[in-house]
Amino acid sequence: MDKKCFLDYLFYSLGKQNHDFYLQYSQEEGVKTKWRKYSEVCVDCENPKNKWFIENCNQRQILPFEVVLDLEEKERINPIVKELKERELIFYVYLTGSRGYHIHIFMKRELTEREKLNMIKQFNADTQKASGKCLISLEYAPHWKSNKIKDLVNGN
């Protein structure tokens, strides 16, 4: 999938235009851009600065109705996927391009940080991903450390 199409999917289809989110470009050497909102760069994507940013951004903010399970072990994926299917939740599993996997779970409403934390703990995943101030590697973009694409491996 094209990165811009995916960003549009997050904003329009999943977020229903109610949830703007931050994007950033980072490199391993510590080079980073300012956090910029989706609406700021994607509405005027023909502007050369915005076009460059969209083409190069590789991190995004976790959405208020999204829970991200950050896992290192591949063998943990299938039991979690089974449970998410039983709960009839919308989810996508990505190989992060770094060491592990991200399971993105999209809920029907916004969650508090505490609710996200409880769900993350239930699956014994990285609790740092409960914060609204946490950036994650952007789907279909090169990871800032490895330069490998964060790619979809499973979803419903």
Q: What are the residue ranges of the model-derived segments?
A:
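Secondary-structure transition/turn motif
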Residues: 72-73, 104-109, 152-156
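Generic alpha-helical secondary structure
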Residues: 74-77, 112-116
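Short amphipathic alpha-helices in soluble, non-transmembrane regions
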Residues: 114-124
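Short amphipathic alpha-helix segments
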Residues: 74-88
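Structural alpha-beta junctions
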Residues: 85-91, 122-125
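Histidine-centered divalent-metal-coordination microenvironment in nucleic-acid enzymes
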Residues: 66-69, 81, 90-113, 135-139
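DNA replication initiation on ssDNA origins
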Residues: 1-67, 75-78, 125, 131-156
